[in-house]
Amino acid sequence: MTSPKDVLRKNLKLIHGCPITYAFANNWEKIEQFQSRPDDIMIVTYPKSGTTWISEIVDMVLHDGDVEKCKRDVITAKVPMLELALPGLRTSGLEQLEKNPSPRVVKTHLPIDLIPKSFWENNCKIIYLARNAKDVAVSFYHFDLMNNLQPLPGTWGEYLEKFLTGNVAYGSWFNHVKSWWKKKEGHPILFLFYEDMKENPKQEIKKVVRFLEKNLDDEILDKIIYHTSFEMMKDNPLVNYTHLPSEVMDHSKSSFMRKGIAGDWKNYFTVAQNEKFDAIYKKEMSETELQFRTEI
């Protein structure tokens, strides 16, 4: 029987060439064989791109903005993470998904190549939320400081090098966003940008409403915007991850919901780091029309 201490602060494990959090990487065939339902809705993000934010928005849209219904459980139960496994600590994502009624909402950080094939076979709707790489790198660094399921991040400079080479959980940010952007040409994928959502949440939430074939009036939309604002979510124990054991997430090192802004990278990148990042970014993104804003 695996105990929590067996999976904490372990090196990432390669699954089909992609580095995956050690605790999640056992029994991978169960992930591959996962049977989706045709009305499943999948939320996909690269880590630290607004996953919890869009998850709560989708839950509120599906429940017509009913705040009480959305308080029915913690976010990790309402929107289970497909690959989540915390041996000896809590229900796995797969076990939680089996319990949840349809239409289920499932979240994942997996790259396209690791998505269970049943999601493609069932033509499940997918919402992909992308965030600019500089802010993701800073947020991921702080996340790895407090998330004991991840390897220790080292210094910010050391971590940035790992991020740029894709030697972090879920691999290369560049490959992740580019492949999902391309995939939307042949699959029902709503591709959203974190920066657009910060700038004009109503406009972006309306896209979610249309995509999920709901019909919500302005009053309900305003309620959803209010209840999914960063300030409200940071103080909401159902979504701010304080419900997880401190041996897994140590909020004394960094809070799960830290700042929730665009442009915080400027407080961390040195001039040299920024120049190197920009050069690699230009090369990696040269073949795609996908564009990001690093501030709003």
Curated annotation (Swiss-Prot):
**Gene Ontology cellular component annotations, sorted alphabetically:** cytoplasm; cytosol
Chief subcellular site? cytoplasm
Which SUPFAM superfamilies does the record match to this protein?
P-loop containing nucleoside triphosphate hydrolases
Q: Where is the active site?
A: H109
Ligand binding (substrate):
K107, T108, H109
One of the entry's Gene Ontology molecular-function terms is: aryl sulfotransferase activity
What does the entry state regarding organ or tissue expression? Expressed in liver.
Q: Where are the transmembrane segments?
A: none
Q: Which reaction does it catalyse?
A: a phenol + 3'-phosphoadenylyl sulfate = an aryl sulfate + adenosine 3',5'-bisphosphate + H(+); 3,3',5-triiodo-L-thyronine + 3'-phosphoadenylyl sulfate = 3,3',5-triiodo-L-thyronine sulfate + adenosine 3',5'-bisphosphate + H(+); 3,3',5'-triiodo-L-thyronine + 3'-phosphoadenylyl sulfate = 3,3',5'-triiodo-L-thyronine sulfate + adenosine 3',5'-bisphosphate + H(+); 3,3'-diiodo-L-thyronine + 3'-phosphoadenylyl sulfate = 3,3'-diiodo-L-thyronine sulfate + adenosine 3',5'-bisphosphate + H(+)
| Enzyme Commission number(s) | 2.8.2.1
Which terms does the UniProt entry file under GO BP? 3'-phosphoadenosine 5'-phosphosulfate metabolic process; epithelial cell differentiation; ethanol catabolic process; flavonoid metabolic process; sulfation; thyroid hormone metabolic process; xenobiotic metabolic process
Q: What Pfam families does this protein map onto?
A: Sulfotransfer_1
For this UniProt record, the keywords arranged alphabetically read as follows: Cytoplasm, Transferase
Q: Which domain of life is it from?
A: Eukaryota
Transferase: present as a keyword of the record? yes
Q: Which residues take part in binding 3'-phosphoadenylyl sulfate?
A: 48-53, 131, 139, 194, 228-233, 258-260
Give the similarity note: Belongs to the sulfotransferase 1 family.
Outline what the protein does.
Answer: Sulfotransferase that utilizes 3'-phospho-5'-adenylyl sulfate (PAPS) as sulfonate donor to catalyze the sulfate conjugation of dopamine small phenols such as 1-naphthol and 4-nitrophenol. Also catalyzes the sulfate conjugation of dopamine and thyroid hormones, including 3,3'-diiodothyronine, triidothyronine (T3) and reverse triiodothyronine (rT3). May play a role in gut microbiota-host metabolic interaction. O-sulfonates 4-ethylphenol (4-EP), a dietary tyrosine-derived metabolite produced by gut bacteria.
Q: Protein name, please?
A: Sulfotransferase 1B1
Q: Which organism is it from?
A: Bos taurus (Bovine)
Lineage of the source organism? Eukaryota, Metazoa, Chordata, Craniata, Vertebrata
